[in-house]
């Protein structure tokens, strides 16, 4: 586990890279969802959490806690455990396991790509803090975007219409 300090400049770079990567990952995820929507029915897996929790509680449990816990586990432990098979393999495997831990085919591509991003940020900075900050930044963009860019906060999570429409060629 690389608990090295991270410079302010690296923090800023991590946040900027994450913000710039977000629309690209969203587009790729949308393309994937658009393709599989023809054969797979999507779930409403997050709707209850939105409707039964306060926004601040949701921010805590969707942004802060996963950022810390998931990054310590996936980048701090899994990535480093499989490093003996080569760094690229370890990055891909830890990213695959990270994506699978998100429980659903409709939520596979984005976490997989984010896992690769998080692992590379850790590699570049030498610190677990980089993927934690990136993960938090990504999650808060997603939550705030869902809250402020849609009329109905829970509707974005009760269907995958936004992600599918972003990836739709129509």
What are these regions (language model features)?
Residues 44-108:
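Function-critical hydrophobic alpha-helical transmembrane segments in multi-pass membrane proteins
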Residues 1, 12-28, 56, 76-82, ...:
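Gram-positive cell-envelope targeting signals
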Residues 2-69:
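Juxtamembrane helix-loop-helix connectors linking adjacent transmembrane helices
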Residues 25, 29, 33, 69-70, ...:
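Membrane-water interface at transmembrane helix exits
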Residues 11, 15, 19, 59-64, ...:
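Residue-level signature of the transmembrane alpha-helical core
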